Amino acid sequence: TKTTQITFDGEKNKIINGITDWVYEEEFGFVRAFEWNSASDKIAFIRFDETNVPEFSMDVYGKELYQTQTVFKYPKAGEANATVSLHIYDLQENKAKEVKVGKDYNDFYIPRIEWTNDADVLSAQFMNRHQNELDLWMIDASKNKSFIAIDEKDKAYIDVTDNLTFLKDDSFIWTSEKDGYNHIYHYDKKGKLINQITKGNWEVTNYYGFDAKNDKIFYQSVENGSINRDVYAIDLDGTNKTRLTKTNGTNNADFSADFSYFINSFSSATTPPKYTLNSAATGNVVKSIKDNDVLAKKLSDYKISQKEFSTIQVNGNDLNMWMIKPANFDATKEYPLFMFQYSGPGSQQVANRWNASNDYWYQMLVQKGYIIACVDGRGTGLKGAEFKKVTQKELGKYEVEDQIQAAKQLGALSYIDSSRIGIWGWSYGGFMSSNALFKGNDVFKMAIAVAPVTSWRFYDSIYTERYMTTPQENPSGYDDNSPINHVDKLKGDFLLIHGTGDDNVHVQNTMRMVEALIQADKQFEWMLYPDKNHSIYGGNTRLHLYLFLIHISEPTRPY
């Protein structure tokens, strides 16, 4: 074996070749930024020049006498991104060349590269900084020619996915929301539409791949209700659609290389995960791998209260909701209500799936006399592009309005004590719970915010600008929806929690909120977890966190 170095300019916090920078990894979901062609004689790679990206520094307290600092490049909204360029290294020529496509881009992203079956032709996705224009380029490395096969535009934004498969003739399968719902399409190699494969007022939630031998596509969708997920097969021409999973809940498939079988992981709100080997032709179970019956039996010994799924009409929309009531629920009594939500764009919390230990805390609270509820408001996913993208340029406006109104309506129920309604969330959910408590101070009496964004000005460029454009272009969208600017409205109990080692949502968010609360002469409680990241775990940390949350959430606690 022989090792050949093909790039020579790499330098920490300046130049990266072939792997992504922090923000690409976090928001575009990939790290390896190089790809071999099918003949193994060319490597395409992305080069990141992050010289001009501002540095973020984070104290690490550790166990030494002096703390240290972690310093890394982190482009916040509106700040300089890494400059990216596409290169192809030719093993025959022992030379790397920069790829120049036939269009000038200013401040852009290259979120995906993938070779076609033709060893000379590379596909590359180029996207503008606003992320509302996506070009799929076909680049012929031998002829130094390129053309755009697909140019998608959206009034809000376009999601980047891995849903691209090249067939033997280099026609390709692609997913898009262009008809209002996420669906599967088939294009010829020039980018001309052959047909739309899936259609309907429902979303394709996962594309598993293409079985070339049988001309079948396998995918997951919410055709059977937006809280459920099922696995389907469909012919390339859009005929012979077959539901392969038979049980309502969340089904997710992992297919064998030849698409003969798949391992199905199934769970529901009442059933812990079950793993089975299934036939891809029929969906029938071939073998049980793990049934979790022992766990299910053990859980049956506890007084577990089930989630009740329903919808609630709020601000003109039917919103998905679950509710958990005490086992000895008495409709003639009044119970305090504690609401959970996340609410981020395209997310879903009201789903028919097993949430394991994340739900055990709710069971403890229910046993202490709470009712727990969760409502997926506007901006959440799997109900079409319009429902999801209504929050564009106003993150936190419509989502908070929906949580406040839902709480009002639930508070009007005879068995809910409207004077004792609380809300909590983590990350985006903490941003939301803070805003809900401040803006809905006549509805919510307490809120918990864990690792919250408190101003989108503090968060990274790719995620934030996808939904908000830049602070320079949209200052009111950023500032009107920042809880920092509404601290004067605080009336109830407020708890802030953050890990000081959070490289994602920096503790700066909480520090700025704390300072604003102090200057507004508002009392509150807060907890910092030293050196813990966005997930706040390790050692006794997560147990400590939840025991603290239980203490804070005691129904007997005065509001």
What does each of the following model-derived ranges do?
Residues 6-34, 42-100, 283-297, 349-359:
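Predominantly five- to eight-bladed beta-propeller fold
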Residues 41, 46, 195-197, 208-295:
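N-terminal targeting or regulatory segments adjacent to alpha/beta-hydrolase or S9 domains
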Residues 31, 54-55, 119, 252-553, ...:
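Serine-hydrolase catalytic core recognition
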Residues 13-42, 70-85, 102-127, 133-138, ...:
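Conserved beta-propeller blade repeats
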Residues 3-11, 97-100, 146-151, 194-199, ...:
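Beta-propeller fold detector
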Residues 53-58, 83-85, 131-137, 180-185, ...:
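Structural motif
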Residues 90-94, 140-144, 188-192, 235-239, ...:
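Short loop/turn segments that connect beta-strands within beta-propeller blades
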